[in-house]
Regions:
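Membrane-embedded helix-loop-helix hairpins and adjacent transmembrane boundary segments
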Residues: 1-178
């Protein structure tokens, strides 16, 4: 599925929509196939070299998603007061905080020699590994989203009603006895 998404994003969204709107369907399909082949080669290389890299990338991806998306989703469901400005500010705070922390210890885009500090426990903030920093980013996201949402206008009434309807599902009808 991910390979299909990558090839479609490159061939249709990037090439057809932006770079070459006149590309034929056959040309777009050819670009998609080439992109998929390149993605397979890159994924295979990164999965093998260095060993353990794929597991680290998955851990970092979950940390990044947790720091940037999870708080906004939770607050969007459980708080009628969280607004778009708060959610965006929180998401950016979570995302930027974890990316900066990762780049400080792992290097910019994992390029050797670009790390600011050694990736060892004695240098980590409160002993928190870059692989685990997503929890800190999520906490920062919650705090910033809460502060910004309460410092700005609340969401419109229809949005607050939508949040309430998500929190308290009504179902399709009454309960029945089987």
């Amino acid at each position: 599925g991910l390979l299909l998404a990558i090839s479609s994003a490159i061939s249709h969204d990037l090439i057809k929509r932006n770079l070459n709107p006149n590309i034929t369907d056959a040309g777009e399909l050819k670009v998609a196939r080439i992109t998929m082949a390149i993605a397979i080669v890159v994924a295979t290389y990164l999965g093998i070299n260095p060993p353990g890299f794929a597991a680290q990338v998955v851990a970092l991806a979950f940390g990044i998603a947790g720091a940037s998306l999870f708080p906004a989703l939770m607050m969007g469901i459980f708080s009628k007061r969280i607004n778009n400005l708060g959610a965006i500010a929180g998401m950016l705070t979570g995302l930027i905080s974890i990316l900066v922390y990762i780049f400080i210890f792992k290097g910019w885009f994992f390029i050797s020699g670009t790390a600011s500090f050694p990736d060892t426990e004695e240098y980590w903030l409160f002993g928190i590994s870059p692989l685990s920093f997503g929890a800190v980013g999520a906490l920062l996201n919650f705090i910033v989203a809460f502060i910004v949402s309460y410092a700005t206008m609340p969401p419109p009434a229809h949005i607050q009603e939508l949040v309430e309807s998500v929190r308290s599902p009504r179902g399709a009808g009454g309960a029945i006895d089987h």
